[in-house]
Amino acid sequence: MIARGEVGGRRRRPQWVVLWILLLGVAGSVLVFLGPGLAGGLRVEGSSLLAGPECTLETAEGDVGLDRDEAKLATTAVALRLRGLEAPDTTGIDAAVLQQLTDGPAGDAGPNLSCRGSAASDLEEQELTGSGLTSRAEEVRAAMTEVFGDQSLGGFAPGGIGQGHGGESTHYDGRAIDIFFRPVTEDNRRQGWILSHWLVAHAEDLDIQYVIFDDEFWSAHLSRGGWHHYEAPAPGNEILRHLDHVHVDVLGGSPG
């Protein structure tokens, strides 16, 4: 109990100190009661005040927290094993996590892994390379090829492209790649989500800005992460809704 007078010759604590201690105790009790979900969601100017896991895997038993290195390792291992190739050592990761990433949500294809967003602010604007992509976008393509092998790609061309996409499309800047999974079937959608999860897990390393697939999008500009509904422009067909392809683009940077 806080002393109401001098104890052992010490002066009485100022009233504001007593009130501050009481408020801290109340705040701590509230956080314990409401759980880690609230603590993980508190942000100050884009930073985590009480940080939760960097990445979250949704399972039937509840959410599983992963750090970014675990998410990168797990998504890479899943992709390589599905190709019948040797995967990196995943001893420190629960086998159930790997199985959940492989199978995806029960019932229908969809997202079950997300990571917090983080967008670098010190990047310089880049010119097109010979492929029609910027160097950052080329790094994404090379990294995908290393893990997923040859894919059906589009949305860029040598010299750049100037039509076929929305007016402000990052495709015109050479910053975007489309990876096709046609026709639109549940199996192809599940394959698309395996790639999408891998991209999100590696987004910080590769300066990825957006991943769009299957009516959903992830953004590096949203610090809390998560997948969000993508509102496709009219006429809202399979292409515009990104049902038949994963769209990934990289951060643009500022003029040097």
Residue ranges of predicted features:
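Secretory-pathway extracellular proteins and peptide precursors enriched for disulfide-bonded cysteines
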Residues: G46-S48, G104-A109
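Extended, low-complexity, intrinsically disordered C-terminal regulatory tails
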Residues: G65-A106, G130-G166, I212, S219-L222
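Second-shell loop/turn segments in exported
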Residues: D122-T134, G166, F180-R189, P235
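Short glycine-biased active-site loop of nucleotidyltransferases that positions the nucleotide triphosphate
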Residues: H165-Y172, E238-L240
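Catalytic cores and adjacent binding grooves of peptidoglycan-active enzymes
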Residues: P183-G256
